[in-house]
Amino acid sequence: MADGQLKVLTTLDHARTQWYHFMAIVIAGMGFFTDAYDLFCISLVSKLLGRIYYTDLAGDNPGSLPPNVSAAVNGVALCGTLAGQLFFGWLGDKLGRKSVYGFTLVLMVVCSVASGLSFGRTAKGVVATLCFFRFWLGFGIGGDYPLSATIMSEYANKRTRGAFIAAVFAMQGFGILFGAIVALVVSAGFRNAYPAPSYADGRAASLVPEADYVWRIILMFGTVPAALTYYWRMKMPETARYTALIARNAKQAAADMSKVLDTEIQEDADRAEAVAAGGAGNEWGLFSRQFVRRHGVHLVATTSTWFLLDIAFYSQNLFQKDIFSKVGWIPPARTMNAVEEVFRIARAQALIALCGTIPGYWFTVAFIDVAGRFAIQLMGFAMMTVFMLGLAAPYHHWTTPGNHTGFVVMYGFTFFFANFGPNATTFIVPAEIYPARLRSTCHGISAAAGKAGAIVGAFGFLYAAQDPHKPEAGYKPGIGIRNALFVLAGTNFLGMLMTLLVPESKGMSLEEVSKENVADDEEATA
């Protein structure tokens, strides 16, 4: 394919930024908005679940989820996400991006509602059905990662492609914030409608029966934004790169893009045949010798950096409520009633999202096509390492009265540089550097490696952060939060080293980056 490029792809690469680009960002981005809401809202209600289903009124403190239950509730959706990323990533290359794009959204809507309707006669029954539905919710969420990234990368022009993909991913920040806002509104409403004493002042009375509705409403509310965008997902045409390069129908690709870009594109039939013929010998498969030679190092880079990043990112996100409790930013559980605790946790998460998480995403949108992917990812990992060390080394200082605000500010900066850094770039790069016929699959593999890291973070941090001298009930002694933060700092440092393998794709077409236009014999003589 070295002898030319299809006109429709050249037109896409040089198209001016226009209304349809922004529509694509919103349509794909609302999926990520819902993904983040559904994945992280569980951290807002897990303490409430412990109070409702595991409280022993003879105890001095309200109930909490047992270790194995807490790990399952927090981590099962991540297991589903990993499976969904692999399956839908592969399916997106086999059947087309659009063909399976709507199904992931339907699965998310159905399972989100079902999660809120979890049932059972015992605590174990409720938790079991909740975990079942959250696994399949995660499965649908997993499909959104490779499909949304691939669709946006294949629609975008090469000048602002990074910003467009980053903007889709940035909707994750608004999803996290929206989850906190929903929890604030719901808990405030129930708190005012059904006042209750703290656990210390009235153990049984601190948990009103209506509190069972709180967590269910919060879990189900994520269906709203997903359902609103389903129609528009179904209206999107298949990407031109899939239609032209994989389905080998350049004429249809030109017709589809002519409609959405308001530009008349006439694809030359002879050119299309020549390009197709040129690519016929370039159809090596995943993990073939040619793939390993061209993209083996790239796959190591995108999987390892995403894996290392998500260990830290999901540890921080899913268990920030526990960290804030231990440093004293959230009062002890026994001094609050059940609904008040949800309100306090949601308020803390909203502040972190507003001050650290969301700004970081949009700094990436602003600078990704200026500084480049490599520089932002390297800088992000480096700064996360620095701030993690800044939290861990003087940890005892941060836990003393009067220093909690400083801890929260430092903690917020780790989120800022995660999102103005590797949390965004690990999503962007795999959507750019692999050939069209393997793009969705390789993005799915990279994302699944990330979710493997998230599972390590979700299950590992819960146990590792336990106080070595005074672990919580049901837990074995761990290494403590201070040492756990040191481990996360080391994880970020390893991510910085692995970033050295990541190629730069700024300002290049997808075909130039992936060398899809270069045959094996041409590459060998280059």
Curated annotation (Swiss-Prot):
One of the Pfam families matching this protein, by short name: Sugar_tr
Record's note on what induces expression: Not induced in roots by phosphate starvation.
Function (record text): High-affinity transporter for external inorganic phosphate.
UniProt-listed InterPro entries: MFS_dom, MFS_sugar_transport-like, MFS_trans_sf, Phos_permease
Matches recorded under CDD domains: MFS_PhT (cd17364)
Keywords: Membrane, Phosphate transport, Symport, Transmembrane, Transmembrane helix, Transport
NCBIfam families: 2A0109
Protein name (record): Probable inorganic phosphate transporter 1-3
Note: Although related to the sugar transporter family, it does not transport sugars.
Species lineage: Eukaryota, Viridiplantae, Streptophyta, Embryophyta, Tracheophyta
